[in-house]
């Protein structure tokens, strides 16, 4: 059972806002174990130089490996280059989201479901759902 998970680091998000990248920075990963265990491992190894990773979303997907995830991620989201931002310490799977795109996606989903089209206040779970939906996890090859 392969699990796709999304994690956030509040300290890294503050750093992203300070340097002008975006405060919406998320780590996208895949694991064969439980997603909580994978996030605990991120904290233990201080992934990207941070020990405050929190799990914000997870989905069980069909077989996918880290290389396949990296390719799909690069095609669909803006992946932050660790060579340009050395503070990321070589982390190659940190994505930057545009809040307006996520808001538009949520509004379209709500409108199609027959709910009001008011722009909601986004939560980390909304960001994680947007990333997982954009990766098209149901069509992994």
Predicted ranges, named:
Residues 1-141:
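Non-catalytic accessory segments flanking enzymatic or RNA/DNA-binding domains
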């Amino acid at each position: 059972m392969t699990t796709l998970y999304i994690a956030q680091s509040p300290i890294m998000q503050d750093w992203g806002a300070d340097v002008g990248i975006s405060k919406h920075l998320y780590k996208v990963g895949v694991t064969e174990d439980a997603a909580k265990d994978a996030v605990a491992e991120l904290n233990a190894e201080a992934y990207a130089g941070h020990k405050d990773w929190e799990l914000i979303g997870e989905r069980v997907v069909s077989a996918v490996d880290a290389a396949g995830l990296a390719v799909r991620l690069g095609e669909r989201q803006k992946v932050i280059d660790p060579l340009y931002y050395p503070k990321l310490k070589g982390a190659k799977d940190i994505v930057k989201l545009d809040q307006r795109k996520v808001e538009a996606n949520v509004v379209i989903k709500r409108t199609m479901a027959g709910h009001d089209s008011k722009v909601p206040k986004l939560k980390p779970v909304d960001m994680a759902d947007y990333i997982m939906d954009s990766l098209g996890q149901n069509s992994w090859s």
